[in-house]
Amino acid sequence: PSLFSLMDNERVKAAWGVPTIWLGLLAEMRKQKRKPQDFSFMLSGGSAVPRSMIQELEKEFGVDVTHGWGMTECSPVGSTTTLGSQAKELSFDEKVELKTYQGRRMYTVDMRIVGEDGKLLPHDGKAFGELQVKGHAIIDGYHEDEEASVAAMTEDGWLKTGDVARITPEGFMMLVDRTKDLIKSGGEWISSIDLENAAQGHPSIMECAVISAYHPQWGERPLLIAVTENDVTLNLEDIHEYLNDKVAKWWLPDDVVFVEELPHTATGKISKMTLREQFKDYKFEHSES
């Protein structure tokens, strides 16, 4: 049976999973024009949840969305978007904005962000750097693997997560990207996650990913790889028109490739490693721009 049918028949009230799972379920909910009966809460982690998905699930279907972040090394949850009592005073759009964050740290979890120079960065909601965590439920090394332990831990005992994040004064953490997925264009950073989430809001895009591709002038430029709904035909101009008021102009992807499906890992995440290998020799048509 489909996931929709399974949840409907079993009267599932709450469910946990990665965004790829929920995007597929949401597509079926649109077709059925309803949600699975009794379904009222979902927790999503593993990768960033698109704003458009949160808005639609909450506004159109009445499903409460909670965003989370974690790692196996954190046992596994590190943060969730529990809004607290102050949420009563927030508008719907303000609540959605907070839910695009990966949330506030769990009890006993400490978080900090560190710049490329190794210095601590302020929790001002603007500065971003590598997210590092420490706590009673977080590893201090890998069993019988000293080399991996040394690479993963700082000298003062913090775990290097490999995620790039910013943290607000109120303690809300938002992932900017994985360190290996950031795009450095002309010396400036572009977040593949932010660009993906913006593009994901297009009504004809079912799923998408952004990777860097070589550019002779800028070093790297974003390449959007997308799956469309019901074989809808789009082009780069359509994508730019949609994204123009959502991201900086220099963030706009230099090209878009449409595919039948994206590769996924065993846990349902989009496999950017596979995409990078597949498009490693990609050349932009207008690379002189």
Predicted regions, residues:
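Conserved ATP-dependent adenylate/AMP-binding module captured primarily in the ANL superfamily
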Residues: 1-13
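AMP-binding/adenylate-forming catalytic core of the ANL superfamily
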Residues: 8, 15, 135, 140-141, ...
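Gly/Ser/Thr-rich phosphate-binding loop
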Residues: 12-17, 26-97, 110, 117, ...
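Active-site glycine-centered loops adjacent to acidic/histidine catalytic or metal-binding residues
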Residues: 46, 70, 103, 163, ...
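Conserved ANL (AMP-binding/adenylate-forming) active-site segment centered on the GW(Y/F)…HTG consensus within
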Residues: 62, 94-99, 124, 138-162, ...
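Beta-strand->loop->alpha-helix junctions that form or flank phosphate-binding loops
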Residues: 66-73, 103-105, 210-214
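Conserved beta-loop-beta connector loops within the AMP-binding
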Residues: 104-132, 151-152, 169-170, 232-236, ...
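Acidic/polar alpha-helix N-cap and adjacent early helical turns
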Residues: 278-289
